[in-house]
Amino acid sequence: MSFDLVINGKTVKANYGETLVDAGLGGWVAIPHDCCSGQCETCRVTVLSGRVDDRGTAERNTVLACQAKVVANAEIAFDHVPEIAKRSGAVTGIATLAPDIIEVTVTLASPITMRPGQYLSVKFAGFPARDLSPTVRFDGTAGPGELVFHIRRYPGGLMSTQIGATIREGHRVQVRGPFGGAFLREGYGPLVLVGGGTGWAPIWAVAAAARREQRHRDLVVIAGAREAEGLYMRRSLDWLMDDGVREIITTAETGAHNPVLPGRPTHYLPSLGPEDTVYVAGPPPLVDAVKIKSRAAWARCYADPFLPNAQPLSLIDRVMAMLRRPAAAPAVTPASRPVPVAAGLPAARKRSEPAPGVARTATPARRSQARSRV
């Protein structure tokens, strides 16, 4: 049994029980997607009319297209996003932000267009690809073609343990993307931004862009860490305060002392309402808790859960890493306050967008894989 599925104005034939992503691909319309497991939120679409089986992913009038299935005629729409592209570059900077958090700067041969809050699949030569969220420097800037990443060093991590050793300045890097639906959108209501751990990276990108492009919107910013010394983002919070943001909260589960508040970011969420837009990134428990509170208040919520890779560094991997390691690796130096190079990330509106309903040839097939951050 087939039905008419209208996607951004284009009608395609869809089979009963197909996911919306597969139905779109069958009609040469690529709904933006990434993990295909309901985690990344890249494929969230708006149901304009008709009926779909939301498979438990409904939020307001939206569903996840990789999970929701065709059961009747329906019309859906999704936000236009930059087309998926590939770029190559090299590591041009490594700095320590906290005992277990490193800033890695990658400069691309040519810039990649993306929206603040989206993420990329990043492959350091010789290592598995990882999903990383580009951000801006702590003074709100980023140079042309420059990607700034905040990476947590996990014990036994295949990639993160090699930063500063095998992965040094000059190391080759390939990126693919962008992905993710938790990007800054135009609007008028208050913004509530919540970041836990290195989830601060995309939240900081969104915050800096909002201060550049949407200064009319009130901002509430909450940054959290397990331990107070993990609040590596304080310089960016100072930047926001100097720029006029007054509602800034930092939390820590241990070691908190004034002005850091004890507990978790969810303990200090403001009273939410339908006029609020919430962005949250970080550990899945934090993301889930914020989504539940947002849903209960009918606030819009865009989420980016950070999922650690469960695969440890094997003995063979350790031996191979030692063989690849140069004889003398330079030390990782503490981050210094950077000199402004260019005003922030490339503006999201400076991009070529396909017309509604036009297929995105950059996504010819489902990209199905577990997302990993280490």
Regions found by a protein language model. Name each.
Residues 62-83, 169-175:
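Short, structured interface segments
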Residues 48, 79-81, 125, 178:
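Short, surface-exposed secondary-structure boundary micro-motifs
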Residues 86-172, 225-227, 252-254:
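Ferredoxin-reductase
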Residues 1-32:
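N-terminal pre-ligand scaffold of iron-sulfur
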Residues 144, 152-367, 373-374:
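FNR/FR-type flavoprotein reductase catalytic core
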Residues 29-51, 59-72, 285:
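Local cysteine-cluster metal-coordination motifs and their immediate loop/turn environment
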Residues 13, 34-36, 69, 113, ...:
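Residue-level "contact hotspot" at macromolecular interaction interfaces
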